[in-house]
């Protein structure tokens, strides 16, 4: 039975986490995204100017084309990509998926053209939301799941230092105490779970649902919760240019916690200072609005405090404080 460890590395301010993946012999740096289910890569089919600064996949070298298959995906931040589809061998942390669908980009939006840190995405949500037509394809995890020692993966993202994706096993050295599991509703293709209540600084409130999303930088919550949090941060104000609430960089921030099946997951205030806002004097908050989408997004700001097990048996999520 297989298992493996892949190291993720944050970019500046922990904006995204990059992990090396070998596809048909070429190693690309991909953003692992538990909020989507497409494995797409920069390819030699893109205009040469858009390949600049990237490792690119050359499908004609090792790939086998799925004739007539196409894909097109758009993300919550407005970015998008599309192209055609090949199968190839894909290796992550020593675990290899044979005949894995690899979505070769032929068009990418400006956001991806400008981001030279990543060479594509590796989706780890449920395969039901894979965008390949006419027939959706399985994610890397779903392809290898049956060969793993346990049908799960786990993630530890860290602040400005490398972390891990563990495939097929749980590394008890990466967390303290014991894991608390909670059920997942995957009807929309996401790792969605419920929190029973939350505490923002000195104020508390009722629970809500959210998704565990490694591909989102911030912790995105209902407006009422966000305003309640920043009402406790002196001098905090909305700055639409910066992307939400900002505050003086020296401000001490309150903690934010959620109760999950009896376990309290706490994001320390120090992690809620995302980094410089870009205006030269303030910092951007790591908690921001979910734009009224009806659920919360537990992105990297939240995940940095936890070791999280994504278990396809159930399915369920396991949480414990990072060691």
UniProtKB/Swiss-Prot annotation:
Using the record for this protein, list the coiled-coil segments as residue ranges, or answer none.
Answer: none
Reaction catalyzed: Hydrolysis of proteins with broad specificity similar to that of pepsin A, preferring hydrophobic residues at P1 and P1', but also cleaving 20-Gly-|-Glu-21 in the B chain of insulin. Clots milk, and activates trypsinogen
Which Pfam family, any one, appears in the UniProt record?
Asp
Catalytic residue list: 33, 213
Write down any Gene Ontology CC term.
extracellular region
Q: Which GO terms describe its biological process?
A: proteolysis
Q: Where in the cell is it found?
A: Secreted
Q: Give each disulfide bond as a residue pair.
A: 249-283
Q: GO MF terms on file?
A: aspartic-type endopeptidase activity
Annotated InterPro entries: Aspartic_peptidase_A1, Aspartic_peptidase_AS, Aspergillopepsin-like_cat_dom, PEPTIDASE_A1, Peptidase_aspartic_dom_sf
Q: What does this protein do?
A: Secreted aspartic endopeptidase that allows assimilation of proteinaceous substrates. The scissile peptide bond is attacked by a nucleophilic water molecule activated by two aspartic residues in the active site. Shows a broad primary substrate specificity. Favors hydrophobic residues at the P1 and P1' positions, but can also activate trypsinogen and hydrolyze the B chain of insulin between positions 'Gly-20' and 'Glu-21'.
Give the protein name, as stated in the record.
Penicillopepsin-1
Species per Swiss-Prot/TrEMBL record: Penicillium janthinellum (Penicillium vitale)
């Amino acid at each position: 039975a297989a298992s493996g460890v892949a190291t993720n590395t944050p970019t500046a301010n922990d904006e995204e986490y990059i992990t090396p993946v070998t596809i048909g012999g070429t190693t690309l740096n991909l953003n692992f995204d538990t909020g989507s289910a497409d494995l797409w890569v920069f390819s030699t089919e893109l205009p040469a100017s858009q390949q600049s600064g990237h490792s690119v996949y050359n499908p004609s070298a090792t790939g086998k084309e799925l004739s007539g298959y196409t894909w097109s995906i758009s993300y919550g931040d407005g970015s998008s990509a599309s192209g055609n589809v090949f199968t190839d061998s894909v290796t992550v942390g020593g675990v290899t998926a044979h005949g894995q669908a690899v979505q070769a980009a032929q068009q990418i939006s400006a956001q991806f053209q400008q981001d030279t840190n990543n060479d594509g995405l590796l989706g780890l949500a449920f395969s039901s939301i894979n965008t390949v037509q006419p027939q959706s394809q399985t994610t890397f995890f779903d392809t290898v799941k049956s060969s793993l020692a346990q049908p799960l993966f786990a993630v530890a993202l860290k602040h400005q230092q490398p972390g891990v994706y563990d495939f097929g096993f749980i590394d008890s050295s990466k967390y303290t105490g014991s894991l608390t599991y909670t059920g997942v509703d995957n009807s929309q293709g996401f790792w969605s779970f419920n929190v029973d209540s939350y505490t923002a600084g000195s104020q508390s409130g009722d629970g809500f649902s959210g998704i565990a999303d490694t591909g989102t930088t911030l912790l995105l919550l209902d407006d009422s919760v966000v305003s309640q949090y920043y009402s406790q941060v002196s001098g905090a104000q909305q700055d639409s240019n910066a992307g939400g609430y900002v505050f003086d960089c020296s401000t001490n921030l309150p903690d934010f916690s959620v109760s999950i099946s009896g376990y309290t997951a706490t994001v320390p205030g120090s992690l809620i200072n995302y980094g410089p806002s870009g205006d030269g004097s303030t910092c951007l908050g790591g908690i921001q609005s979910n734009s009224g989408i009806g659920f919360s997004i537990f992105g990297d700001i939240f995940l940095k405090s936890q070791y999280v097990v994504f278990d396809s048996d159930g399915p369920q999520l396991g949480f414990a404080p990072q060691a």
